[in-house]
Amino acid sequence: VRIAVPREIKNHEYRVALTPAGAHELTSRGHDVFVEQGAGLGSAITDEEYLAAGAKILASADDVWAEGDMVLKVKEPIAVEYPRLRAGQTLFTYLHLAADKPLTEALLASGTTAIAYETVQLPNRSLPLLAPMSEVAGRLAPQVGAFSLMKPSGGRGVLPGGVPGVAPARVVVIGGGVAGVNAATIAVGMGADVQILDTNVDRLRQIDAQFQGRLRTLASNSFAIEQAVREADLVIGAVLVPGAAAPKLVSNALVADMKPGSVLVDIAIDQGGCFEDSRPTTHAEPTYDVHNSVFYCVANMPGAVPRTSTYALTNVTLPYAVALADKGWSQALNDDRSLALGLNVHAGRLTNGPVAEATGLVHTPLETVL
C-alpha cells in the first residue's frame, strides 16, 4: 500500500502523523511511505531520518496526497486540502466532525473513506487514540491557565500555589475523564485548591482514592457547577461525549457572575466546547475576554508540545495504521470492532450516528457499509 504523510498546515500545528520508527515498520512490511518535505521538522524530526527509515520525501503536498492510497494525518483537513480528498483513498486522522459540518460535507462529496482517531473505541468504552492527547491537553491546561491568570495576560494576578500565609488559587475541573484527571494532577502539583466534578459517582470514588484527599470531588449537576464556578479562579472544561458535540455547562450569565480576571480553559473545544461563549482560538491568539474573564479555547493544544505529543500519538496509532495497510480498510475494520467504530464516512455515506445528529445529515448504519 502507498502511504502518504503530509505536513500539517493548521495554525501552529507542529505534530506529524508518523515517526521514522513508524515509517520503518511500514516499509519493512513492504509498503511505500511518502512523506512531505519538512513534515517532521516541527517535532524535531528531519527528512534524513525518514529517508534512513525507508520513506521517500516529496516536495509538495499535492504530490504526497496524490501518491497515497492511505493518508495519515494528525488534524482534520482544512479548506485548502478539501480538493485533495478523493474516492478510493483512506484518510486516518482526528476529524471531530460533530463540530464541523463543512468538513463532513466535503468528505461525503469526495467519496473518500475517513476513519477518525477519536471515535475508535474499545469494548470498555475507552478511546485509545484520544487518550494520549487528552493526557497532553489535560496536563497543559493548568499550565496555560496559570499563565493566563497572570496580570499581564489579563488574569486576576493569582499564583496557583499561593505562598505561605496566602491562599492558593481555586481550580475547578469539570469532567473526571482522562483529560480532567490529568488536569487535576498538574493543578494539585502546583499547589492549587482543586475541585473536580463528574456525573459518575463511581468515577469520583476512583479519583478520590487516587488523590488520597489532595482534592475535593463533587457530583456534577447544574447547581453544583454554578456554585463551584462562581468561586473559581481557574475553570478547566474537560467534558467529552464520544463523537458528539460537547454539552454547554457554563452559561454566559454564569461567567458574568465570576470574579473579574478569572480564567476558563476549554479542552472540549474541538468538539464544540463546554462553555456557552467558547469559540475556537489558535496558538497565535489563544485567548479572548468575556465579561472580564479570560477564555482559552485553542483547538489543538497538544500541537504546542509536539516533541511529546507526536510520540504519544504515534505510539497508539501505529498498530491500527499497520492493520489498515496490511489488510486494507474493509478487512481491517471487519476484523476489529474497535477500529470499525472509527469509520465516520465511506463513499458518500455518513456512518457515525452522533455526527449525523450534530450536523443534521443523513445517517447510514455502520453495518450496511462493512
Language-model segments: residues:
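Short glycine-/small-residue-rich Rossmann-like dinucleotide-binding loops
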Residues: 69, 75-76, 95-96, 221, ...
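Rossmann-like adenosine-cofactor binding region
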Residues: 209-292
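An N-terminal-biased, well-structured beta-alpha scaffold segment characteristic
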Residues: 2-110
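Adenosine-phosphate binding glycine-rich loop
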Residues: 118-159, 269, 274-370
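Glycine/serine-rich phosphate-binding loop and adjoining beta1-alpha1 elements at the start
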Residues: 2, 8, 79-170, 298-300
